[in-house]
């Protein structure tokens, strides 16, 4: 249960990037919201598959955690938080798993390499997308929507098989914070304040 919907979604995102041409050695893959549930699994999966992973976080104290999952570069959230001023920036990222949306996603689109793809999995930073179509028209960037609810059965089987094969168990264990039902009110407050990292595994029998 520690993998959960977040881990399943992360695997779907990685598969979508692969289906749209992501291969090892073409440059770093960006993961926004990297210390969260989806982001943590995405970092671990991409690193295990041999990709150079750049992890975006607004919490400096999570750097050691993210590097332990396999991130090779830590990108401060502030570096990508400003709204788009130029529709295109230097081509930097070979792929991206984005859990943030909003202004950060708009900024990332302008930094993608030619023909690269962004898998959008969340909207922690907002549902609006203050971007231009220039990255799509001049660099052939792909924006891929990831839905974990209505996936066909065969794709679900494929994703879970990939999780079993590609997600290192030691990395999964490093993401888990055990909790009980009595801990839930405090955990709720921590979630709203952005203080939770990785996955919380609630023992309903404790």
Predicted segments, located by residue:
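Adenosine-nucleotide cofactor-binding segment
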Residues: 47-103
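Glycine-rich phosphate-binding loop and adjacent beta-alpha segment
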Residues: 103-169, 204-206
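C-terminal hydrophobic helical "lid"/dimerization subdomain
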Residues: 157-206
């Amino acid at each position: 249960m520690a993998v959960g919907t977040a881990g399943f979604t992360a695997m779907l995102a990685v598969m979508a990037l692969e289906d749209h041409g992501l291969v090892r050695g073409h440059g770093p893959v960006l993961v926004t919201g990297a210390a969260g549930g989806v982001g943590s699994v995405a970092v671990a999966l991409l690193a295990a598959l041999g990709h150079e992973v750049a992890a975006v976080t607004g919490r400096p104290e999570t750097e050691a955690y993210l590097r332990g999952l396999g991130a090779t570069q830590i990108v401060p959230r502030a570096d990508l938080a400003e709204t788009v001023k130029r529709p295109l920036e230097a081509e930097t990222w070979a792929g991206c798993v984005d859990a943030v949306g909003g202004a950060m996603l708009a900024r990332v689109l302008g930094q993608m390499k030619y023909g690269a793809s962004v898998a959008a999995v969340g909207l922690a930073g907002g549902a609006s997308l203050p971007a231009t179509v220039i990255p799509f028209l001049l660099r052939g960037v792909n924006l891929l929507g990831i839905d974990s609810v209505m996936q066909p059965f065969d794709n679900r089987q494929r994703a879970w098989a990939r999780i079993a094969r590609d997600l290192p168990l030691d990395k999964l264990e490093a993401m888990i914070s055990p909790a009980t039902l009595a801990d839930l009110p405090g955990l709720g407050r921590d979630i709203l304040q952005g203080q939770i990292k990785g996955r919380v595994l609630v023992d309903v029998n404790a």
